[in-house]
Amino acid sequence: MATILSTIVALFIFLTLSVILIKFLIVPSLVNYQYGLLNSPYFTIGESRVQGVGIFTKRPRQMGERLFVAVDMNENVTPVGSKINHCPSMKTISASGRVATGDTMMPNSYLSPHADKTTGEWWIMAARDLGVGEELTADYTYTPDFIQKPDPSWKCEL
């Protein structure tokens, strides 16, 4: 009886550790590899507070800093650019009724107003100083016409 019980406990521990390893190491590594960020010192892909997965900073960023190319010279959204979640500008009210203001105001990044004159690429820019681990968000409402616009009723949950 003790052998069966110890086998069940060992199996439970093995399965639990396997789930933890898969969820917190293997899946994030695969997702970051897919988007070219596996060993990036700048960004990582992770579970979003807004929706699905998002892109997060790995180091502090300065307001106005170019973060990465979001749209290439052929007007195709880059894989990394596709991971920025939409948050409407102005005041955003969460389900709890909290209004975002000041440093917590989203969006915290934006698409450059024009393509780079030399490369034809569109960059994501920091709208304010960003801390380590912040999810990047942008307002898609005023992006160029070749980028799909968001549902006007969408509200960014904080």
Where are these regions (language model features)?
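Residue-level "contact hotspot" at macromolecular interaction interfaces
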Residues: 50, 54-56, 60, 129-131
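Intrinsic-disorder/low-complexity, polar/charged segments enriched in Ser/Thr/Lys/Arg/Asp/Glu/Gln
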Residues: 56, 66, 121-123
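C-terminal helix/juxtamembrane-tail motif
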Residues: 2-4, 144-158
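Terminal signal-anchor or tail-anchor transmembrane helices
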Residues: 2-30
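A detector of low-complexity, intrinsically disordered, Ser/Thr/Gly/Pro/Ala-rich segments
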Residues: 1, 5, 14, 99-102, ...
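Catalytic core of the SET domain in histone-lysine N-methyltransferases
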Residues: 36-48, 72-146
